[in-house]
Amino acid sequence: MKLLVTGAFTITAEQFDMLSSLGCEIMFQKDERGKPECDFSEADAVICNRLFLYHDISVFKNLKLIQLTSAGLDRVPIEEIKRRNIALFNARGVYSVPMAEFALSGVLSLYKHLNTFYESQKSHIWQKDRNLHELCGETIAIVGCGSVGTECAKRFSAFGTRVIAVDITKPKNEVYSDFYNIKDIKKALDIADVVVLTVPLTDETRNMFNKDMFSCFKENSVLVNISRGAVVNENDLINALESGKLSGAVLDVFKCEPLNADSKLWDIKNVIITPHNSFVSSKNNARLFSLVYDNIKNSMKGLV
């Protein structure tokens, strides 16, 4: 099997040897946007992230397997992959723990006014704040209860919160206190102190959180978006924040990345902005390689 590995996955010498021992002949494409550094038409399998945004899949004549380094499927030509019967794997579960920790830390930062204390520290000022909040007893709505959402639920639940699930189908995990079908999402938003978005980007979820949806949020609630930026209408979010409908937001993803320097979001009080970084962890490589190795091994055995 000829395996194309892009710069989206940093392969170690040990991992290279393990894949080679399976019978893989490994080719490299460091820059997914750049000109082909090898013959794409020879690749039987690909490990990538955004490769097919910059290179037409028709060039990959022999392609039988795609292993994405991302959890989302919005960067690949799904219909063509189905038509050609190409095995497609995402990185489900690989980034769930760091993303969940990130979501929780962001909310805690807002509730405990950590940014205020940080600014005081930089100026060498001893300034107390008597208006802090606690998570215990709050209601957390997780919109999208897959692997990331469920890991978020586990961590928020550990802080004594009531965690409710919002999804198409009811999750089997007992960490959720209640379930709302996505059709009834507005009922969930009305009672949630914190709303965490972990939904995939689809035609149905694009701009899902708009003016109409924000009007249903509980007063002074907090929005956390660690899914995809295009799920949220940013202008409507800005209005909801400036009007005081939302008391804060933790935003790791945006419709256009990098976020434009003149975006109002940068300067709104109680908004935490991070550069699509919530998934990062020193443990990701090992988790991802475990998936890669098993999927390629099974494919070569004809089990995929």
Roles of regions detected by a PLM:
Residues 7-9, 92, 133-157:
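Glycine-rich adenosine-cofactor-binding loop
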Residues 89-102, 116, 255-304:
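C-terminal helix-to-coil terminal segments
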Residues 159-175:
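NAD(P)-binding Rossmann-fold cofactor-contacting core
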